């Protein structure tokens, strides 16, 4: 039989989270961000749950081609624009909208021969200092684009660095609005955190489009200040495996490589068929939460390439049977309906839910429900 591990993508949860993003930004259209292969979910697997969006935003032409092959005829936005001049031809052929964030991209457009003018999103560096024109140069970049016959329509975009934290977005939205004042065109500024935390009461933050990313996949961008449940989000990916062995420990016995865990009393542990080669974080410490048969317990010892060890004592003390064949939910929704949010696992491992989703290994079988 196949190794007993599986990831499940939940279509209804994707639909629920998309509806939640839309409700948080009334009157704005929603980009479903599917970069990084839909945050590890798989573009093809996530498409049915996200096809109610107004457009798809992604990174490269390969992802754009895949979305078109799925039958999508609506807007597609390249969030980082094109990477070389010849990409513009495929943008024309696939009717892609694309960001413009540097002078070189404007140069490529000006030299491009096309019969289908381009829809571009001029990106401002309003304070994050990654991509985009700084406010002092933004209008000059707009003027260059506006003079090009290759450009049909110019929209405006920026990206917030601190929408999920106490610093907030005021300094960036003010800079953006000042630089774009009176310029004609649509605006998109909000990522997931800004959409949930700031868009409801400020039309400037809602803009014409919001870019829903991690919110679609059931993770809270501002965890642990707020949980996914607080925002009404449902888990869209479940990683589950089976217990393939058990051991009875006595006080003083150690577990795993490096003997990093020592039992302080008699206890039962289960060996789960999941390890860092499956995408589970190797640096997750003892105490990282896990569900066994829907009951919350913890990992013990180091994560191995193919196995994790978990404490079964709390289940036995509660009168819940657990042993070989029992279900272990590493994150997501257990068969009984109990939920372990991916953000909790990520926090214990010192990372974020985004990384765990994107790290799901190719060897893990994936099903869609």
UniProtKB/Swiss-Prot annotation:
A molecular-function term among this protein's GO annotations: alanine racemase activity
Residue numbers annotated as active site: 35 (proton acceptor), 257 (proton acceptor)
UniProt binding sites for substrate: 130, 305
Pathways per UniProt: Amino-acid biosynthesis; D-alanine biosynthesis; D-alanine from L-alanine: step 1/1
Reaction catalysis annotation: L-alanine = D-alanine
Co-factor(s): pyridoxal 5'-phosphate
UniProt xrefs under InterPro entries: Ala_racemase, Ala_racemase/Decarboxylase_C, Ala_racemase_C, Ala_racemase_N, Ala_racemase_pyridoxalP-BS, PLP-binding_barrel
GO biological process, one term: D-alanine biosynthetic process
Pfam family, one: Ala_racemase_C
GO cellular component: cytosol
Isomerase in keyword set: yes
Annotated keywords: Isomerase, Pyridoxal phosphate
Modification N6-(pyridoxal phosphate)lysine occurs at: 35
PANTHER family given in the database record: ALANINE RACEMASE, ALANINE RACEMASE, CATABOLIC-RELATED
Family classification: Belongs to the alanine racemase family.
HAMAP family cross-referenced by the UniProt entry: Ala_racemase (MF_01201)
NCBIfam families in alphabetical order: alr
Biological function: Catalyzes the interconversion of L-alanine and D-alanine. May also act on other amino acids.
UniProt name for this protein: Alanine racemase
Lineage start: Bacteria, Pseudomonadati, Pseudomonadota, Betaproteobacteria, Burkholderiales
